[in-house]
């Protein structure tokens, strides 16, 4: 595939990708244009998902998107092969196989700026504009062109040539930071959320009592009706009847496999058995939340709070829920609580707070094609926690007067 053309917006984004956008929105843009973004790599550190960026890479187009691992918002766009991506700025094009992004060409297009910085160890000179930087490799024989870390602009070598950019960085400039290669890359951060945004809103969960949404001020107690939930949170993104878990026992563990509603025939009993369940979920994907209603009483009986960590089969189905499960205090004064369980809490820390609960139930997600493998579900009174193999929580279930229930 030839080089594509994307609009360059310094300090804002490139093409359909905007700094600060949640990772779910980036995937939605990708899915809308499968012929353009036909090769997509998702990279993350599976041992410590919160330690390094989540990266969406487009190797055929020479750029990738870096998402903050905690907020899952786009913090940095890096173009690492400028020959594979052509950018449109105003009415001019730069990059791609036909328009070299040389130092002179960049300087002519974007105008004069302050002298950049020279990294002698890397042999790279970086030129900065608000929300935009260009890195240029400097051959060792010309390193003396950058006197005291600076160079005369536009940069040209004694033989009449000018360097071609090796990396372009697009980042939020509101904090006044300069972002480039190496350690300068870590300075990029997602732009501030707009006032009143509910993205990453803290959701306080009091075991056995209610959820409280700290930005909007909504309270959803156990026993609330569907009408109560609609009036507080609005129309759900989806409504689904609860799936039923088929339970087997392997090596002393209970193995839960989620199945769809179906008719099951037994060789010894030709009469069909169904897995119909009257309970149903309200799905709030944009809040990272599911609410389970009792099919008989139509009252809230459970909340499912999703972390949206990569490495789980539900990754990218929900926006991350920034929940805070409050343990050992008096509601609603959250400052009185001795312990809190959040999406960043490790499973070992959960056990320190709530105690050991014994062996886990293994959940297979009902698919042999799931590349992430099974998860482990641990039950306590009024709560259950699902974790992936690396000890991170992938969702938390808050219920009332009950133990683990699939």
How would you label these PLM feature ranges?
Residues 1-406:
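Short helix/turn-capping signatures at newly exposed starts of structured segments
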């Amino acid at each position: 595939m030839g080089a594509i053309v994307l609009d360059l917006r310094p300090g804002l984004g490139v093409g359909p990708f905007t700094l600060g956008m949640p990772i779910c929105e980036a995937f939605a843009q990708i899915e809308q244009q499968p012929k353009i973004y036909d090769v997509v790599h998702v990279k993350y550190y599976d041992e410590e998902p919160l330690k390094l960026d989540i990266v969406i890479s487009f190797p055929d187009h020479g750029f990738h998107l870096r998402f903050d691992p905690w907020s899952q918002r786009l913090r940095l766009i890096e173009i690492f092969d400028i020959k594979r991506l052509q950018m449109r700025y105003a009415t001019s094009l730069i990059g791609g196989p036909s328009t070299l992004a040389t130092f002179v060409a960049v300087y002519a297009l974007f105008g004069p700026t302050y002298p950049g910085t020279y990294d002698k160890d890397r042999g790279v000179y970086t030129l900065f504009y608000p929300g935009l930087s260009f890195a240029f490799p400097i051959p060792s024989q010309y390193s003396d062109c950058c006197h005291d870390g600076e160079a005369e602009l536009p940069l040209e070598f004694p033989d009449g040539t000018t360097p071609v950019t090796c990396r372009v960085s697009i980042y939020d400039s509101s904090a006044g930071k300069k972002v480039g290669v190496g350690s300068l890359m870590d300075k990029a951060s997602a732009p501030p959320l707009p006032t009143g945004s509910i993205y990453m809103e803290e959701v306080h969960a009091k075991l056995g009592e209610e959820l409280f949404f700290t930005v909007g001020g909504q309270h959803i107690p156990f026993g609330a009706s569907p009408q109560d939930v609609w009036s507080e949170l609005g129309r759900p993104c989806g409504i689904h009847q609860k799936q039923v878990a088929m339970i087997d026992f392997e090596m002393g563990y209970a193995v839960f496999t989620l199945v769809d509603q179906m008719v099951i025939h037994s060789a010894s009993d030709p009469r069909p058995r169904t897995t119909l369940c009257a309970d149903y979920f309200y799905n709030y994907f944009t809040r990272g939340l599911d609410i389970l209603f009792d099919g008989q009483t139509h009252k809230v009986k459970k909340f499912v709070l999703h972390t949206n960590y990569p490495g789980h089969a539900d990754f990218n189905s929900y926006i991350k829920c920034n929940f805070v499960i409050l343990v050992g205090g008096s509601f609603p004064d959250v400052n009185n609580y001795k312990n809190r369980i959040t999406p960043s809490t490790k499973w070992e820390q959960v056990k320190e707070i709530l105690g050991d609960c014994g062996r886990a139930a293994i959940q297979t997600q009902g698919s042999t094609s799931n590349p992430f493998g099974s998860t482990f579900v641990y039950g306590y009174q009024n709560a259950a926690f699902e974790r992936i193999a690396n000890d991170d929580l992938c969702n938390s279930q808050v219920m009332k007067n009950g133990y683990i229930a699939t």
